[in-house]
Regions:
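A charged helix-plus-loop insertion that forms the helical arch/lid used to bind
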Residues: 84-95
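Glycine-rich phosphate-binding loop of actin/hexokinase-like ATP-binding domains
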Residues: 130-191
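Hydrophobic "anchor" residues
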Residues: 22-23, 86, 151-152
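Short beta-strand segments
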Residues: 6, 72-76, 114, 133-140, ...
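ATP-binding/phosphotransfer module of carbohydrate and carboxylate kinases, centering on a glycine-rich
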Residues: 1-69, 81-83, 101-108, 126-129, ...
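Conserved phosphate-binding catalytic cores of ATP/NTP-utilizing and phosphoryl-transfer enzymes
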Residues: 111-135
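Short, active-site-adjacent cap segments at secondary-structure transitions
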Residues: 77-81, 119-121, 142-143, 152, ...
């Protein structure tokens, strides 16, 4: 039995998932925005949710947690530091906190944490024998690698994290020297993200508009908004080209508000031949429009890998 929990700026939720992968129960919640309050909230949610199941598991106070129960946590835009602490662009109060250590102390449960891309890749994989790359495009950009059904973390816990790698094959107007939040220039997240969409639109129109509205206008045929999205799609193709050349994944999963399920699967393969070694790429592309449930499933898979 696994408890899966997701912290997101869109939908946060918790679920009890059986060993067979079935959702025993699930609920959404509004996360606290204070670190200690959040830890207590998570402990309380676990106690309440497990006590109300018919499985006989009673997490109760931390000391009474069942040894067969474990906690997997998915946090949007999560990053890891070498000292075991984390950061999150969505939840800045988590910055520099030893989240996994404190979770285990607060809940009494063996715990594992991952970001949306990592949990999405684990939760949405179709075959355990495939190599998969997952990409999440939202306020930030994150990536992850899944091989043989398991998350590849890497020596520094950053495998697949292409966020702050340079945009491949840049054209002159993209080399404007704009500085990323990390202090470098030319980072992928600077171009492939919701703030990146807004920046491109403002450069064209000198008008501020939310990424939500730009994406909506593009679907309605607005020429300027559509041109911004076309540039984004070309950048996604370029960002994935080195991934294909190096990893050659069987499957690429993309999620996020800017990931159009009707456009990207057709557009990306047409752009890749100019950037990759394979002359006729057969990489499978899947767009996940709602990643909440896959991320919960992935959080459960993440902790099972640890245990």
């Amino acid at each position: 039995m696994t408890i899966a929990l997701r912290l997101s700026d869109t939908v946060s939720g918790i679920a009890v998932i059986s060993d067979d992968g079935d959702f025993v129960c699930e609920q959404t919640f509004l996360p606290e925005i204070d670190y200690q309050l959040l830890l207590r909230q998570i402990s309380s949610l676990i106690s309440g949710l497990t006590a109300n199941t018919t499985t006989g598991i009673n997490a109760g106070p931390p000391a009474n947690a069942s040894p067969s129960t474990a906690l997997g946590l998915c946090v949007s835009d999560l990053r890891y530091a070498s000292n075991g602490s984390v950061t999150s662009a969505v939840f800045p109060f988590l910055d520099d906190k030893p989240l996994m250590r404190d979770l285990q102390a607060a809940t009494g449960l063996t715990s594992a944490i991952g970001n949306d891309a990592q949990c999405l890749g684990l939760g949405a994989r179709q075959h355990d024998n495939e190599t998969l790359f997952s990409l999440v495009i939202d306020k930030d950009l994150s990536g992850a690698i899944i091989m043989n059904g398991k998350l590849v973390k890497g020596r520094n816990n950053h495998a697949g994290q292409i966020t702050h790698t340079p945009l491949p094959f840049p054209v002159p107007f993209e080399l404007d020297g704009s500085v990323c939040s990390c202090g470098r220039t030319g980072c992928l997240t600077h171009f492939i993200s919701l703030p990146g969409i807004e920046k491109d639109y403002k450069q064209l129109t000198n008008t501020d508009k939310s990424a939500d509205n730009i994406i909506a206008d593009a679907t309605k045929g607005d020429i300027i908004a559509d041109s911004v999205i076309q540039v984004l799609e070309d950048r996604i193709a370029r960002a994935l080209a080195p991934v294909i050349n190096l990893l050659d994944p069987d499957h690429i999963i993309i999620s996020g508000q800017a990931a159009d399920k009707n456009r990207l699967p057709a557009i990306l393969p047409r752009k890749w031949p100019g950037y990759i070694v394979a002359d006729k790429p057969t990489t499978e592309i899947t767009i996940i429009t709602d990643r909440h449930v896959p991320c919960l499933n992935g959080a459960a898979s993440l902790v099972l890998q640890k245990t």
